[in-house]
């Protein structure tokens, strides 16, 4: 099982869709070697070095956290059922209300739309918020996602810069 890495006072909580099999086997988030999460958050400015999946707890040192919409591991996120995403969205709102990070970054547009019953959303900052927490939708860093790493970094850096502009 891949546990959440959460604490009060975080700049951002990154929310993946669900654990892949590599993460489920190791217990660490974003553990598959092809997953670009750790590289992208470093290059975007969230960490001062590229962490390894087994160093996930160190995210807290950078005021970052990690959670997921669905606990059940799958080979591909497309295997996650709509009812799981909807339930996960409700659970995620409760977590965010409890921890109150400055921002929530949901990693995947379709997962966000299904988990939060939204339609036709754009990438980036959303109109909805959870209390004082800004909600962002960023591209998923999975190696199965064809988006180029440079575009991922650009999208994640936009969030980092928005937080810096708010003094966070």
UniProtKB/Swiss-Prot annotation:
Keywords: Cytoplasm, DNA damage, DNA excision, DNA repair, DNA-binding, Hydrolase. The keyword Cytoplasm applies. One of its GO terms (biological process) is base-excision repair, AP site formation. Its main location: cytoplasm. It catalyses: Specifically hydrolyzes mismatched double-stranded DNA and polynucleotides, releasing free uracil. One of its GO terms (cellular component) is cytoplasm. SUPFAM superfamilies: Uracil-DNA glycosylase-like (SSF52141). Its EC number is 3.2.2.28. It is found in: Cytoplasm. InterPro entries: MUG/TDG, MUG_bact, Uracil-DNA_glycosylase-like, Uracil-DNA_glycosylase-like_sf. GO terms for molecular function: DNA binding; pyrimidine-specific mismatch base pair DNA N-glycosylase activity; uracil DNA N-glycosylase activity. Belongs to the uracil-DNA glycosylase (UDG) superfamily. TDG/mug family. Excises ethenocytosine and uracil, which can arise by alkylation or deamination of cytosine, respectively, from the corresponding mispairs with guanine in ds-DNA. It is capable of hydrolyzing the carbon-nitrogen bond between the sugar-phosphate backbone of the DNA and the mispaired base. The complementary strand guanine functions in substrate recognition. Required for DNA damage lesion repair in stationary-phase cells. Binds DNA as a monomer. This is G/U mismatch-specific DNA glycosylase. The gene is mug.
